[in-house]
Amino acid sequence: MGKLFGTDGVRGVANRDLTPELAYKLGRAAAYVLKKKYNGQGIVVGKDTRISGDMLETALAAGILSVGLNVLRVGVMPTPAIAYLTRELKATAGAVISASHNPMEDNGIKFFSGSGFKLPDEVEEEIEKYVLGEKEIPIRPIGAEIGRVREISDAVLLYKSFAKNTVELPFSGLRVVVDCANGAASYVAPKIYEELGAEVIPIFNTPDGTNINANCGSTHPEALMRAVVEEGAHLGLAHDGDADRVLAVDEKGNLVDGDQIMVIIGKYLKKKGLLKNNRIVVTVMSNLGLKKAFAREGIEVLETKVGDRYVLEEMLKNGAIIGGEQSGHIILLDHNTTGDGIITALQLMQVIVAEGKKLSELAQEMPKFPQVLKNVRVLDKEKIMASEELAKAIARGEKKLGEGRILVRPSGTEPLIRVMAEGADAKLTEEVVDEIIAVIEKL
């Protein structure tokens, strides 16, 4: 990856790292590069509910307009809705101003191609060269050639209609608590679930620009877990700031994570004869229980590095229609080109209604192995990862765990080594992790 773009676009503290000046340059460079690569009506621009969204949207739009491309403005909108609208409006590309589940001080800008997929690395690298001044943008249109802003007033209606059409059964009788993370889901998710017949109790659905993801949403589901029990609901749904992921809570107040949601949806699709190529893509961090649950069903599990970008690549390469992460970032390629928390929630509710089972019963189809994850701060990740002592410690741990597994990997962004183990016995699993950490700390 280049100097600006990370695995999920350009991110940083708004107005310090991600400044309006940088947003303008990004808009200008992206519009110039994407205009040459893809035909279309302009660039769809949407955002989440962060206070810095207005500032960055204005600057990004100015950059796009300055190279003669139109801006199709959709306002506050879930990230996956922008991927869909980019396709639906036959746009050149899509741009999202969001930092997803990060704190409100952060923001980010990422782009989708005209087909609604994240941009390939080489396109991001080309955009980067223009932003950093390594290449000069040779055009400066004047007069009638300058771009215009078009307000897409029916954007919410278009996405709502699209999302609702991904399910067949009404949700009447379902009582659902929905945590909108004070983010982009606030204006869309509760309405979609209600219009399909569910009784919806929304919480954290009053964004003020500064409360996005604040002790709420998929990274802080504790309030939702309590609310589901207090309200006597059948389930709870926790979105994050840009609604590209969802976690669920069963009627007893227990968390149902992305691994369990994939097992529930994957098994249902197989039963209905809809699981194309009979395979699913997960990351190395997915719980061992997931692999065992799918093995029992004869479903092939493919593993990738952590990150939805890698999950999507593997899905496209192997013709899989479902893939995702424990965090609730799940891609259902039959419906959308990126992780879509609202559409994932709809498929989950469809299984509950179709099977006539409680979510707690469905979640039991994947018994979770106790998982222990600890981080060790180190000076030289490469040296430690290559050491023979570490390899021996891992082998000893694997022997001790028996049926479990151990994963030791360096962090991609910090000076840390992550040690994760899974096993049938929680106490033994923790002991094994601590023993490996003790070896790392001596190296």
From Swiss-Prot:
Residues bound to Mg(2+): 100, 240, 242, 244
Gene3D superfamilies cross-referenced by the UniProt entry: Alpha-D-Glucose-1,6-Bisphosphate, subunit A, domain 3 (3.40.120.10), Alpha-D-phosphohexomutase, C-terminal domain (3.30.310.50)
CDD domains per record: GlmM (cd05802)
Cellular component annotations (GO), alphabetically ordered: cytosol
Cofactor(s) the protein needs: Mg(2+)
Catalytic machinery residues: 100 (phosphoserine intermediate)
Domain of life: Bacteria
Post-translational changes noted in the entry: Activated by phosphorylation.
GO biological process assignments: carbohydrate metabolic process; peptidoglycan biosynthetic process; UDP-N-acetylglucosamine biosynthetic process
Cofactor, free-text remark: Binds 1 Mg(2+) ion per subunit.
UniProt cross-references to InterPro entries, sorted A to Z: A-D-PHexomutase_a/b/a-I, A-D-PHexomutase_a/b/a-I/II/III, A-D-PHexomutase_a/b/a-II, A-D-PHexomutase_a/b/a-III, A-D-PHexomutase_C, A-D-PHexomutase_C_sf, Alpha-D-phosphohexomutase_SF, GlmM_bact
Enzyme Commission numbers on file: 5.4.2.10
Catalytic activity, reaction form: alpha-D-glucosamine 1-phosphate = D-glucosamine 6-phosphate
One MF term in the entry's GO annotations: phosphoglucosamine mutase activity
Keywords from the UniProt entry: Isomerase, Magnesium, Metal-binding, Phosphoprotein
Modified residues (Phosphoserine): 100
Family: Belongs to the phosphohexose mutase family.
HAMAP family linked to this entry: GlmM_B
Function of the protein: Catalyzes the conversion of glucosamine-6-phosphate to glucosamine-1-phosphate.
The protein, known as: Phosphoglucosamine mutase
Annotated source species: Carboxydothermus hydrogenoformans (strain ATCC BAA-161 / DSM 6008 / Z-2901)
